[in-house]
């Protein structure tokens, strides 16, 4: 997330479990509730991740409230990680906007976000493929470019 021009890294947590009721429960603490529902629909339609019968809880750790499209991909990855009960790669930062067609779109200031991740010791960065052409290559962090949510879910 960018606060003015300063990057602030946030932890996105998700819990996905089978619903015991006819209508699944969905909550979002610190993230836009409607955006989370939209991202779940994109996962269902574009990546074949069937969440329609599952309860889903999304939380931004530390009580922060974040409303930036760049965290879309992080929410998607957290949801899939919980749904599949598989952890993401350790020391990984994720950013990218997700569109309705399942495409992963560029976000502003990718180089600043990556520089901050390197300073904090992250080893991997999953980001929009289109951002890679504007990034200075470095051996301090492994850059993984993706172009769709279908590509993203293959990483978990």
Name these PLM-found stretches.
Residues 1-156:
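Peripheral, non-AAA+ core regions of ATP-driven protein-machinery
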């Amino acid at each position: 997330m960018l606060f003015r021009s300063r990057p602030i890294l946030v932890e996105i947590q998700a819990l996905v479990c089978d619903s015991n009721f006819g209508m699944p429960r969905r909550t979002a603490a610190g993230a836009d509730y409607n955006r989370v529902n939209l991202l779940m629909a994109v996962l269902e339609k574009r990546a074949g991740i069937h969440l329609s019968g599952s309860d889903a809880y999304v939380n931004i750790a530390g009580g922060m409230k974040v409303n930036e499209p760049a965290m879309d991909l992080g929410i998607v990855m957290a949801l899939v990680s919980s749904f599949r009960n598989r952890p993401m790669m350790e020391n990984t930062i994720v950013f990218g906007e997700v569109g309705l067609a399942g495409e992963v779109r560029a976000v502003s200031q990718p180089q600043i976000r990556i520089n901050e991740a390197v300073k904090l010791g992250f080893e991997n960065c999953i980001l929009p493929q289109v951002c890679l052409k504007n990034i200075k290559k470095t051996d301090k962090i492994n850059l993984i470019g993706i172009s769709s949510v279908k590509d993203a879910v293959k990483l978990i």
